């Protein structure tokens, strides 16, 4: 409406305008509206409530949050903290005590929780979490993340140690007016070190390396983090590659020429692109105008994205796909390189007028037949060489690592996860590679739609928890005691442990969860507190037998309770419980209470810290661990194997994605991600084989 109003006012004020300007204005507005109308698809799809409905953008506020990527947090761009910054403190009015300096977050609107289906929609104003004031800060902060191993990785990329970082005098305590009360010297990267990381990692390694993959060559398909033997760009010219990376002929075959991701273009596409770029830029006034159009396309989809993303090191996967638009732009210049070569050959053949004027005739208008024939022959050779040799070289190098024929590993391995689950079961997953293949198998192939896939990363959000209660095609909604009002508005995002007021007795799981959800006293400075982290789930063992979770002969060995100890869990030593942990415990306990009709599993690839201290109660049935009322028979705190179920699943239900087909070694391309999936299967097979050797009877409980 604002855009239309501004356009109407402008047209009214300028009553006499050329038709050309009116046409451009109307077409521009039309194109803008067509572009923005694509966002309507998100709202329409979300209102249909499909099984996969990320962020549930069914209203303007959640749509805004979705488009601004708020779930990924904020990244400092122009001014902000570094990885050496710490929180500032504010002096209290009494003049003695301090408190952490926090700034109130912005007010956001969220969809109100309905207490009945016929209640009208409402929107609630909520203040975002307080933002802690950090010190020291710097301009253009590139090294800011304190997560995991990021601080050490920053230092490695700038070839420095903690001692090499300079100290700056910075305020650490301020009064209510912002005046410095106390300052101290604190470490902070220098601006030179900051720029060194920016160019070494973000620009060179995370952009130009990918650029050179496409126009110079690639060492192998292994994800790298700066190593000389993983994922670098190469040219195929030994004098260049050996100087940069060491003697490439000494690499093991799987790291060098034996790796299908090993591609060499001898920099021919790069040279063609540079020639095309120069030809367009210096051709004429029209050429330079067109050059700037392509250049901004190249820059805004390449280096501008580098500036915006501000990527920390140790990325979980290669990010070359983020810059595909930039590579498309350079490919335009590669095509123009043919015309540039035509001009270059004309100049070399002694026809400078053609270079300047773009014509084949000299200025006097008289053509030299011999020279024209010679030029035409040379140009035919150049066109043939460029038009065939360079593309053929690229195709011959990249065909084998782009050919996916005969490879169905992603589909089949996703089905194998689902095949490990009993009917109507629940499987908890965590990462992309153990979630999206399962969703594909269910939604596209229609395979095992009775299984409910629960992604633990998404389960930290209220919109995903709400979706878990909704039935999908083939699977009923999940039952758990928490209601939308209990976890709405990030209320249970993180519940702290309070050792001083903690209940150390082991209580019923629903007593603990009810206290967390509803007890008004279970708070600390506005945040929820889990006061009862030691809990038990009644095993309901006889119902587990009827549901097929355990066998009749295993019933005498079943435990009366399944014990959970979240606090001081050695595999997850954190200071509180997440919403994901609370809801996953709730789901497991509820299905056990209701007769184990929806047995719970954890995908084999889920890290141990997500197991809720249930490891000794979990048995491998293929590619998933089933929660059962049986403890590990060897008395350890680790998972174990249900040999009966796993053997049946592996031998009767598993698929192998084409890897079981007869053919020459290397017929099917297996990139690093697929090879990791294959390794997961191999590990499962080895564990099963070892279990079968250890237990001579059909079941270890016999």
Regions found by a protein language model. Give the residues of each.
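Residues that form or flank phosphate/diphosphate-binding pockets in enzymes
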Residues: 436
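ER/secretory pathway lumenal C-terminal domains and tails of membrane proteins involved
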Residues: 1-318, 322-323, 330-424, 439-697, ...
């Amino acid at each position: 409406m604002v855009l239309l109003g501004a356009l109407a006012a402008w047209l009214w004020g300028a009553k006499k305008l050329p038709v050309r300007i009116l046409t451009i204005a109307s077409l521009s507005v039309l194109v803008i509206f067509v572009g923005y109308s694509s966002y309507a698809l998100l709202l329409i799809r979300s209102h249909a409530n499909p099984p996969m409905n990320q962020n549930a953008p069914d209203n303007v506020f959640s749509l805004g949050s979705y488009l601004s990527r708020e779930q990924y947090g904020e990244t400092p761009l122009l001014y902000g903290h570094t990885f050496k910054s710490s929180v500032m403190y504010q002096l209290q009015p009494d003049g003695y005590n301090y408190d952490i300096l926090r700034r109130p977050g912005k007010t956001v609107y969220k969809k109100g929780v309905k207490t009945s289906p016929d209640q009208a929609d409402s929107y609630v104003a909520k203040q975002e979490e307080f933002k802690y004031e950090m010190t020291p800060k710097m301009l253009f902060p590139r090294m800011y993340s304190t997560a995991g191993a990021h601080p050490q990785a920053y230092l490695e990329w700038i070839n420095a140690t903690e001692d090499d970082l300079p100290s700056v005098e910075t305020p650490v305590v301020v009064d209510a007016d912002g005046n410095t009360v106390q300052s101290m010297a604190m470490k902070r990267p220098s601006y030179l070190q900051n720029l060194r990381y920016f160019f070494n990692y973000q620009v060179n390694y995370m952009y130009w390396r990918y650029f050179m993959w496409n126009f110079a060559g690639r060492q192998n398909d292994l994800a790298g983090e700066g190593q000389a033997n993983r994922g670098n760009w190469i040219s195929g010219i030994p004098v260049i590659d050996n100087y940069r990376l060491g003697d490439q002929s000494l690499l093991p075959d799987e790291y060098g020429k034996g790796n299908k991701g090993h591609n060499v273009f001898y920099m021919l596409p790069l040279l063609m692109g540079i020639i095309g770029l120069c030809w367009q830029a210096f051709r004429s006034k029209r050429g330079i105008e067109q050059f700037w159009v392509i250049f901004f396309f190249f820059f805004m989809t390449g280096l501008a994205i580098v500036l915006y993303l501000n990527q920390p090191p140790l990325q979980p996967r290669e990010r070359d796909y983020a810059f595909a638009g930039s590579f498309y732009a350079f490919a335009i210049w590669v095509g123009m390189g043919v015309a540039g070569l035509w001009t270059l050959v004309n100049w070399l053949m002694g026809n400078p007028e053609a270079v300047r004027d773009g014509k084949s005739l000299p200025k006097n208008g008289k053509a030299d037949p011999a020279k024209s024939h010679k030029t035409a022959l040379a140009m035919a050779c150049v066109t043939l060489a460029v038009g065939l040799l360079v593309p053929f070289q690229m195709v011959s190098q990249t065909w084998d690592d782009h050919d996916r024929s005969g490879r169905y590993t992603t589909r089949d391995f996703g089905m194998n996860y689902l095949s490990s689950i009993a009917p109507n079961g629940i499987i908890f997953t965590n990462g992309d590679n153990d979630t999206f293949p399962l969703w594909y198998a269910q939604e596209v192939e229609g395979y095992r739609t009775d299984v409910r896939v629960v992604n633990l990363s998404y389960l930290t959000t209220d919109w995903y928890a709400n979706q878990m209660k909704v039935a999908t095609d083939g699977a009923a909604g999940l039952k758990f005691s928490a209601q939308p009002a209990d976890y709405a508005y990030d209320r249970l995002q993180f519940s702290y442990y309070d050792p001083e007021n903690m209940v150390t007795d082991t209580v019923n799981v629903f007593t603990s969860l009810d206290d967390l959800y509803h007890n008004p006293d279970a708070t600390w400075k506005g945040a929820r507190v889990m006061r009862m982290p030691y809990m038990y789930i009644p095993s309901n063992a006889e119902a587990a037998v009827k549901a097929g979770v355990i066998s009749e002969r295993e019933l005498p060995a079943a435990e009366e309770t399944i014990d959970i100890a979240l606090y001081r869990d050695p595999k997850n030593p954190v200071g509180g419980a997440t919403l994901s942990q609370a809801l996953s415990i709730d789901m497991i306990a509820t299905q056990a209470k209701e007769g184990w009709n929806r047995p719970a599993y954890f995908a084999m690839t889920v890290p141990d810290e997500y197991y809720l201290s249930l490891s000794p109660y979990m048995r491998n049935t293929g590619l998933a661990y089933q929660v059962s009322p049986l403890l590990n028979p060897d008395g350890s705190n680790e998972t174990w194997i249900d040999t009966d179920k796993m053997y049946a699943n592996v031998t009767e239900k598993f698929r192998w994605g084409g890897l079981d087909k007869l053919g020459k070694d290397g017929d099917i391309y297996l990139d690093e991600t697929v090879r990791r999936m294959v390794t997961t299967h191999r590990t499962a097979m080895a564990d099963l084989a070892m279990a079968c050797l250890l237990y001579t009877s059909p079941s270890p409980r016999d």
